[in-house]
């Protein structure tokens, strides 16, 4: 892998939803990320403002890029958003994610979504969880592993090798 590319870049390349919505990865490294997205006609609701789900998706994408910039596969454990003001068709939104803290396999990240000119649209906070690789079947389980679902059972993402 190119040394300037992180695991987040690899993840983003495979992110069909974000790419189809026109989200652009601006940067991702060392627990931070920047992503941008234009608000198109197909993203506005009945009030003719950007649907909050699209704003959330942009923030969530920046969050995912920031927490995956360290390497091991990391997923959202929870997230919430506060909408400060509406975005409109034609706006270009920038989401800036920053790591607040990491502890064990968990982390907290803040994302500010703003218009290109800097006006804040929304504030997002995400909680992350780094996944553990599945244990090899030919070794003794670690303490507590016996309580996990068997390979291929509930809790396993098919084809990922992670729980």
Where are these regions (language model features)?
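Hydrophobic beta-strand-centered segment that forms part of the acyl-chain substrate-binding groove
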Residues: 64-94, 99
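Hydrophobic residues in beta-strands and at strand termini
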Residues: 37-39, 83, 130
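Non-catalytic linker/capping segments at the edges of enzyme domains
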Residues: 1-36, 40, 139-163
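HotDog/MaoC-like acyl-thioester-processing domains
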Residues: 1-2, 70, 87-89, 98-163
